[in-house]
């Protein structure tokens, strides 16, 4: 699974398909392939292990022609990274690419083998190719064959099929894995992400759950899950395909804050269905490894460390598995004891953080059961050297102060926690569904949270002339306070500290005065009453409070305490949600102070030296 591109045109489509794959490279992949058929029904399939450039060179050398084609970048889930496991897969005249996980692939494989089909690869995708080929023997069209096949597939998928004997059309089915159709003039396209098509069209249609669409040069016909023909909205996109262009935004950081809803959708794509987490989508052999884990050790730096600190509460509260979190530069120099059946998790946006990479190499010598990384950059050292990788797919992040990398790490960690609890039988189906539904709701909720921008911009003026700021939180909101503190100091150069609110009496309370803003992250939960007592301690000593809480929390503002009332969201994802106003606050304080938001002094995006 990873990236899909398809095209039906009068002109040769090889260049369009390969360029589309280039635009999807940020999503992570280990192999790439393309299949193109010309008007005389001659089909050329080329697959390569490695970079899209290697595929591009092979396509150029072969001088591939043809107006109908599909292409794919693969991140291995079923079957090792290899050319034979790379997409597209074929069965007779049928060629298929696929994103996602077919959960009943073993059952279908046995059925197909009983019918005489021979499998060349280890992938679940080849099952789809054979199923479509089988159904086409009795179906009236490729469309009908794909519809019949889709009804037999279980899991999250987006799949595209092409028939060599009929090069005038391709058929796509969507269930849990996004598919967008692009409209041209006398040509039409499809992809798993509109970014792949922005160089050929700006008009897009997004398929809905259960849709199957037939695409020709001149028409796109969509059928819903019941088989009824339906119309889907066509929209004009103003998205920027170049990550190096700030577009309408003043800074990359602001742009990347606003990209978070889409980034979260990308992170979740193919990894959750309507009510469950797809464990195999996390990595090769993930289900087997997670079923044996007795302890989790997270190692990271900076923002990624704060994400790990947040996830520690989830591992213990949701999955019932002990979890330690260590700063990589400390972990690697400590004489630690490896617990039995321990899983090492490294977190890094770049995948090249020197201390984290060194910690991984050290840990592999110390008997960890397995090492995985949660990372945003495919092909990075952490990805290559870990046993398996969970790519966040946040897209290129240019601003030094991480935003979308943090929230996508958190969503990836929450999916991992849920999968771990699921594989060990520690969470119920009902709890799994509750978590997944909260994740599905998160992108829209964050989009709504961004509407607080003007209110927070006005609030930022209170901080711009201060020299210090204190952030407080309890439970998983303590590391969210840590992340808020880090953001403020990174880009505004204001000294900021974060404390677990219960630690106030143990020192920080001595700092409280009218010149010390105190920001409190205070959603409604079982620690709220304890947090309220800490708020009163600050209030009694003349501190100026800024409390971010939902209406149910029951705070009443006055001249010493400003309440920023947030919508109520699920407790499960509230830590991710409350990150957004903290990012906006830091951004606008820095803007008022006139600092270099995207490239703050003394800092680099990726710390590749010790």
UniProtKB/Swiss-Prot annotation:
It is found in: Cytoplasm. The keyword Translocase does not apply. Residues 286-426, 459-600 form the SIS domain. It catalyses: D-fructose 6-phosphate + L-glutamine = D-glucosamine 6-phosphate + L-glutamate. It holds the Pfam family SIS. Keywords: Aminotransferase, Cytoplasm, Glutamine amidotransferase, Repeat, Transferase. Signal peptide: none annotated. The keyword Cytoplasm applies. The active site is at 2 (nucleophile), 605 (for fru-6p isomerization activity). GO terms for cellular component: cytosol. Residues 2-218 form the Glutamine amidotransferase type-2 domain. GO terms for biological process: carbohydrate metabolic process; fructose 6-phosphate metabolic process; protein N-linked glycosylation; UDP-N-acetylglucosamine metabolic process. Its main location: cytoplasm. GO terms for molecular function: carbohydrate derivative binding; glutamine-fructose-6-phosphate transaminase (isomerizing) activity. Its EC number is 2.6.1.16. Homodimer. This is Glutamine--fructose-6-phosphate aminotransferase [isomerizing]. It comes from Vibrio parahaemolyticus serotype O3:K6 (strain RIMD 2210633). The lineage of its organism: Bacteria, Pseudomonadati, Pseudomonadota, Gammaproteobacteria, Vibrionales. The gene is glmS.
